[in-house]
Amino acid sequence: VPKTTRHHKNFQQGYLVQLKQVLKMKDLNRLHVSVFALHLLLTAMFIYVPSQLINFAEIPLASHGWVYLPLLVISLFFAFPSIILAEKYRKMRGIFLTAIGGIIAGLLVMIFGFESKYILLLGLGLFFIAFNVMEALLPSWLSKAAPIQSKATAMGVNASGQFLGAFCGGILGGQLLILNDTAMGWSILTAIAIVWLLISFGLSQP
């Protein structure tokens, strides 16, 4: 009976090599920061916005679903053409940066017009449109930027950034409620989005 040679692959070592490779790629790191910032802002908003709708828009908590649903549907009508434009005409970087700008614009509207019901809703609408564009673009860009042999590792790091962003957003949203200063609260969220935009300017067209 011929002897067979068995080769044992060190999967842990291979994973660590891939992880180091992924963490050294600047564009991937910017995408990880993006998913972190996006879900931080979203979670903070969902904690912070209900009090704003009650206090300034005079919309009872039980009716908030009827605010979010139309805004979500409207935002999808804007999101789909943006995604097609980004993929078909290779405008992903421009639309990506524009979407972050849309998030900033929505937050700025809420800084200066939070006392008006309709301006507050306009700001929320801008935010949700930009959010849905970003939510669709990020996975697509990640799959293009990640090396073939390290795609799973890159997606794992990105998913960790998403959950960490939601965790930090929950903490931030709670702190904004405790702060009890509406203009300052929106300003803090806007500042985070501006830092995110500045970091994202370094992204290359995929």
Model regions and ranges:
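A late C-terminal transmembrane helix in Major Facilitator Superfamily
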Residues: 145-180
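C-terminal membrane-cytosol helix-exit motif in multi-pass small-molecule transporters
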Residues: 1-7, 199-204
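Helix-to-loop junctions at the C-terminal end of transmembrane segments
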Residues: 78-91, 177
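A membrane-interface helix-boundary motif in multi-pass transporters
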Residues: 175-193
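C-terminal transmembrane helical hairpin of 12-TM major facilitator-type secondary transporters
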Residues: 92-138
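Multi-pass alpha-helical transporter architecture, strongest
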Residues: 188-206
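Extracytoplasmic gate region of multi-pass secondary transporters
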Residues: 27-69
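Juxtamembrane intracellular "pre-TM" segments in multi-pass secondary transporters
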Residues: 2-34
